[in-house]
Amino acid sequence: MKFVSLASLGFALVAALGAVATPVEADSLTAGGLDARDESAVLATYNGKCYKKDNICKYKAQSGKTAICKCYVKKCPRDGAKCEFDSYKGKCYC
């Protein structure tokens, strides 16, 4: 009985080592269509106008609708001042 369990344990260990030691091809991800997108450093900014009372920025989004975001770090200096929304960082700058 001990010999059978020892043999099956040894077989499982050898199979696991074989799976771990199998080399992975470097091009296997790109061949399967799983390559990384080249959009990681693309900065899309949208210009708009800020409003001092609520400290918000209103801008036209990509969909064409008016979007609103709260100004980040600096307060809006006056109504109608220039602001921009950075879609990469997800923050508004007034």
Curated annotation (Swiss-Prot):
Q: Keywords in alphabetical order, please.
A: Antimicrobial, Disulfide bond, Fungicide, Host cytoplasm, Secreted, Signal
Q: Which residues are trimmed away as propeptide when the chain matures?
A: 22-43
- Check the record and name the Pfam families matching this protein: Antifungal_prot (PF11402)
**Entry's InterPro entries?**
Antifungal-protein_dom_sf, Antifungal_prot
Q: Which GO terms describe its cellular component?
A: extracellular region; host cell cytoplasm
Q: Where in the cell is it found?
A: Secreted; Host cytoplasm
Output one GO BP term: killing of cells of another organism
- Disulfide-linked positions: C50-C76, C57-C83, C69-C71, C92-C94
Give the residue range of the signal peptide: 1-21
Which Gene3D superfamilies does UniProt cross-reference here? Antifungal protein domain
Task: List, alphabetically, the SUPFAM superfamilies matched.
Answer: Antifungal protein (AGAFP) (SSF57598)
Of which family is this protein a member? Belongs to the antifungal protein pafB family.
Function of the molecule: Antifungal protein that acts as an inhibitor of growth of a variety of fungal species.
Please report the name of this protein according to its UniProt entry: Antifungal protein
